[in-house]
Amino acid sequence: MVSLEKNDHLMLARQLPLKSVALILAGGRGTRLKDLTNKRAKPAVHFGGKFRIIDFALSNCINSGIRRMGVITQYQSHTLVQHIQRGWSFFNEEMNEFVDLLPAQQRMKGENWYRGTADAVTQNLDIIRRYKAEYVVILAGDHIYKQDYSRMLIDHVEKGARCTVACMPVPIEEASAFGVMAVDENDKIIEFVEKPANPPSMPNDPSKSLASMGIYVFDADYLYELLEEDDRDENSSHDFGKDLIPKITEAGLAYAHPFPLSCVQSDPDAEPYWRDVGTLKAYWKANLDLASVVPELDMYDRNWPIRTYNESLPPAKFVQDRSGSHGMTLNSLVSGGCVISGSVVVQSVLFSRVRVNSFCNIDSAVLLPEVWVGRSCRLRRCVIDRACVIPEGMVIGENAEEDARRFYRSEEGIVLVTREMLRKLGHKQER
């Protein structure tokens, strides 16, 4: 383990990102989000009033000083590709800055799409090697968080690791959804199990397990060697968590990086924020959390901006209807192009170009772009997919049986509404 002085840290914080390339795994469908991902990959799902989920990983790279990125796509990639082309095309290729789109290509070697997360990188090795990076940062494109990857790179170099895995404690009852690890006093990973049925607890806290966040730093040459070896293994599932990380752990070359060391927060005393919005409830709740008085995730931090494609839109407008009732909102996010006419919006998130007509009550709802809500509607505890036309007088979120019959209703009572569901009920979706 190498001990570094403060000046060395500052120098490495500038140099290491320039020697790195980030690969963002963005090909997943996200089946637990149900119909919300029928026509888009999970990283392309809207979030936080104006963003897409992938914007967080991309923004973290830019803010960390990493200016070379590859986005690996597969499932329903058109929306994602379009978003990146529109919103992330400001790089200067002459300065060796870029976002490369790396779709599944079914190369001549075989007819397989990506067989796993590791295989997604393997199938693009010929392209990735051209980047001539010393370090490769592997990221999931479907998580919400703010992290300074330069701090993780420094930790990787300081510990003399060949592979570093970002980790954080999670409640033990949720740990079966993650890779779970045990570490020694130097953060060397001594055991790693992917999605165990009975996850081991942390020695100092039996209520929690130490979980992998799916964020990795590799020495580039070591990663390429591992991937080529894994590609030849017919018994491998070609997945980082299931195959590569356990193998590296056995070799004694994997180290853990505690997420609090690189989590970017405005309040240093706050709990580190990282969310996998992979279920409808988690997605709904994470959106509504941003509308709270003091949200856990600070979206207004000028030192760590979240970038996205910014469409030219007029400001949101709140107007009275013909009867004189005023449009108003409380504890909500309302994006550009929205018009709220004589209705009440409480604890909700309205994306761009949403129109709420008179006499409506919107409570704890997430309305994606271009939703049109007819007069006298009541929407509660729901997610309304893009461009839905909610007919006059419709009530959602008040009658569990009625909601389950018409739409998708989660076990926690969150209702998902899509254009296809409304069409099946006989409601026209064209205006």
From Swiss-Prot:
Sequence positions that bind beta-D-fructose 1,6-bisphosphate: K39, R419, E420, M421, L422, R423, Q429, E430, R431
Chain positions recorded as AMP binding sites: R40, H46, R52, R130, E370, R386
EC number: 2.7.7.27
Record key words, sorted: Allosteric enzyme, ATP-binding, Carbohydrate metabolism, Glycogen biosynthesis, Glycogen metabolism, Nucleotide-binding, Nucleotidyltransferase, Transferase
One BP term from GO: glycogen biosynthetic process
Any Pfam family hit: NTP_transferase
Residues annotated as binding alpha-D-glucose 1-phosphate: Y114, G179, E194, K195, S212
Cross-referenced InterPro entries: ADP-Glc_PPase, ADP_Glu_pyroP_CS, GlgC_bac, GlmU/GlgC-like_hexapep, NTP_transferase_dom, Nucleotide-diphossugar_trans, Trimer_LpxA-like_sf
Reactions accelerated catalytically: alpha-D-glucose 1-phosphate + ATP + H(+) = ADP-alpha-D-glucose + diphosphate
Role: Involved in the biosynthesis of ADP-glucose, a building block required for the elongation reactions to produce glycogen. Catalyzes the reaction between ATP and alpha-D-glucose 1-phosphate (G1P) to produce pyrophosphate and ADP-Glc.
Family: Belongs to the bacterial/plant glucose-1-phosphate adenylyltransferase family.
Protein name: Glucose-1-phosphate adenylyltransferase
Species this chain originates from: Shigella boydii serotype 18 (strain CDC 3083-94 / BS512)
Upper lineage: Bacteria, Pseudomonadati, Pseudomonadota, Gammaproteobacteria, Enterobacterales
